[in-house]
From Swiss-Prot:
Cofactor(s) needed: Mg(2+)
Signal sequence residues: none
Annotated knockout phenotype: Increased resistance to pathogens. Simultaneous knockdown of akt-1 and akt-2 result in dauer formation and a weak extension to life span.
Gene name for this UniProt entry: akt-1
Protein name: Serine/threonine-protein kinase akt-1
Gene Ontology CC terms, in alphabetical order: axon; cytoplasmic side of plasma membrane; dendrite; neuronal cell body; protein kinase complex
Active-site residues (renumbered): D316
Protein species of origin: Caenorhabditis elegans
Top-level taxon of origin: Eukaryota
Keyword set, alphabetical order: ATP-binding, Calmodulin-binding, Developmental protein, Immunity, Innate immunity, Kinase, Lipid-binding, Magnesium, Metal-binding, Nucleotide-binding, Phosphoprotein, Serine/threonine-protein kinase, Transferase
Entry's EC annotation: 2.7.11.1
Residues of the AGC-kinase C-terminal domain: 451-528
GO molecular function: ATP binding; calmodulin binding; metal ion binding; phosphatidylinositol-3,4,5-trisphosphate binding; protein serine kinase activity; protein serine/threonine kinase activity
All residue ranges annotated as the Protein kinase domain in the record: 193-450
Length: 541
């Protein structure tokens, strides 16, 4: 499905504003590719491999942009008649570079883009609103052998006690209403926590093990610098992570307790999974047994299936983002690259992710859908069972060629069921990939490799993990890099180089993060009626 409409097949030739051949620069393998582009009067800029045939429905585009509120810039080097368009890809601002056959052709395209952009600039109108339809939840065949898997994927186990993830959503709404007065009294700041150890450090900030003073509970707090987020144009990714964490409650997703902001920082207070990254454990063991890989794979499939049911594509599957909790269960972390509002058939084309884990359709400059996550699952499960990446080269161009055209190789010890699963997940064509159909995760649940899995028991954490991290206490950080845990716990003040920011500049920076704060009500439902926890219910800020 096109980003800008329910279906390109519903478009009409008479709605085309301008069309013709342009060369577009690839985003990964950065060569120039001829594409037949069309601008429609609703602001859609669609690119096709070949000119659409007259009198026939438009095919699905390779490129799909929205030029409402677009900006353009002209260049003459390294090629003449170049131009750059800064526009929207879903909710993300992106830049794409083109060149035309002549200055006159380029000017016609610039004029069309600017005319459309001016038409919609500053409006909240959705030119495709009349084409939108409700995304219906599928009905489950209760007599099916895989009914339990379907319930687990949807986060609706058909029986059993479950945990907070299975609590009726209406109960959470009641708890919000009942505790609104308490919420008004409860504003979370850094002063509410004791900082204990640094768990990780990156460009945008730090992750620190902390203890909430009021409850004495341990959390991992991710503290990000606002100025760096803005300078690196990561505002959209940061806000997406916040929204996804707020929306999604699942046993195998890291749970957000609070998000709040200080003058210079954004803070995510999250569950602390002290079993460390799966990457650490694979590196230590070399390979996992197939039963161990099956256990982790089943939990990952359920979590991603749940995200997909919420119309969210994860897009950053890698061993470093798969944590183990103290009992040995999976916790998927880091939701900054998620893309929202992507259901079956929907596409996006933003380049993101770790090079070794990128799916072929991403590298080939195609729009892609939720099936990229199943490619990522194929890569991490290959690493677990084979001890190496399926495709690897230090040279990124060579790496990308291997991902797009290389053959899979398996160690002789691998079972036929494991080979079939990995081969299905690592199919180059996303439409033929295991999980690529409308049933999504359920296709993978049916694989012979997962034949012995009780999916509902897996969801309820009733299956004993094959490995339990050897942690001595709640504050044990032995599975985290000593390079970080040995560092002093302190925050680096924002850079003061150059002139101090004006009041207007400060207000502009803060305006990027309005409505950021969140206090987790869902996680407190089971404690609503405990007198000692009367103040444990929080507001939505």
């Amino acid at each position: 499905m096109s980003m800008t409409s329910l279906s390109t097949k519903s478009r009409r030739q008479e709605d085309v504003v301008i069309e013709g051949w342009l060369h577009k620069k690839g985003e990964h393998i950065r060569n120039w590719r001829p594409r037949y582009f069309m601008i429609f009067n609703d602001g859609a800029l669609l690119g096709f491999r070949a000119k659409p045939k007259e009198g026939q429905p438009f095919p699905e585009p390779l490129n799909d942009f929205m030029i409402k509120d677009a900006a353009t810039m002209l260049f003459e080097k390294p090629r003449p008649n170049m131009f750059m368009v800064r526009c929207l890809q879903w909710t993300t601002v992106i830049e794409r570079t083109f060149y035309a056959e002549s200055a006159e052709v380029r000017q016609r395209w610039i004029h069309a883009i600017e005319s459309i952009s001016k038409k919609y600039k500053g409006t909240n109108a959705n030119p495709q609103e009349e084409l939108m339809e409700t995304n219906q939840q599928p009905k489950i065949d209760e007599d099916s052998e895989f009914a339990g898997a379907a319930h687990a994927i949807m986060g609706q186990p058909s029986s059993g006690h479950g945990d907070n993830c299975s609590i009726d959503f209406r109960a959470s709404m009641i708890s919000i209403a009942d505790t609104s007065e308490a919420a008004k009294r409860d504003k979370i700041t850094m002063e509410d926590f004791d900082f204990l150890k640094v768990l990780g450090k990156g460009t945008f900030g730090k992750v620190i093990l902390c203890k909430e003073k009021r409850t004495q509970k341990l959390y991992a707090i991710k503290i990000l610098k606002k100025d760096v987020i803005i300078a690196r144009e990561e505002v959209a990714h940061t806000l997406t992570e916040n929204r996804v964490l707020q929306r999604c409650k699942h046993p195998f997703l890291t749970e957000l307790k609070y998000s709040f902001q200080e003058q210079h920082y954004l803070c995510f207070v999250m569950q602390f999974a002290n079993g460390g990254e799966l990457f650490t454990h694979v590196r230590k063991c070399g390979t996992f047994s197939e039963p161990r890989a099956r256990f982790y794979g089943a939990e990952i499939v359920l979590a991603l299936g749940y995200l997909h049911r919420c119309d969210i594509v994860y897009r950053d599957m890698k061993l470093e983002n798969l944590l183990l909790d103290k009992d040995g269960h999976i916790k998927i972390a880091d939701f900054g690259l998620c893309k929202e509002e992507i259901s079956f058939g929907d596409k996006t084309s933003t380049f993101c992710g770790t090079p070794e884990y990128l799916a072929p359709e991403v590298l080939d400059d195609h729009d892609y859908g939720r099936c990229v996550d199943w490619w990522g699952v194929g890569v991490v499960m290959y690493e677990m069972m084979c001890g190496r990446l399926p495709f690897y080269s230090k040279d990124h161009n060579k790496l990308f060629e291997l991902i797009m055209a290389g053959d899979l190789r398996f160690p002789s010890k691998l079972s036929q069921e494991a080979r079939t699963l990995l081969t299905g997940l690592l199919v180059k064509d996303p439409t033929q990939r295991l999980g690529g159909g409308p049933e999504d995760a359920l296709e993978i649940c049916r694989a012979d490799f997962f034949r012995t899995v009780d999916w509902e028991a897996t969801y309820r954490k009733e299956i004993e993990p094959p490995y339990k991290p050897n942690v001595q206490s709640e504050t044990d950080t032995s599975y985290f890099d000593n390079e970080f845990t040995s560092q002093p716990v302190q925050l680096t003040p924002p850079s003061r180089s150059g002139a101090l920011a004006t009041v207007d500049e400060q207000e502009e920076m803060q305006s990027n993060f309005t409505q950021f704060s969140f206090h987790n009500v869902m996680g407190s439902i089971n404690r609503i009626h405990e007198a000692s926890e009367d103040n444990e219910d929080y507001d939505m800020g």
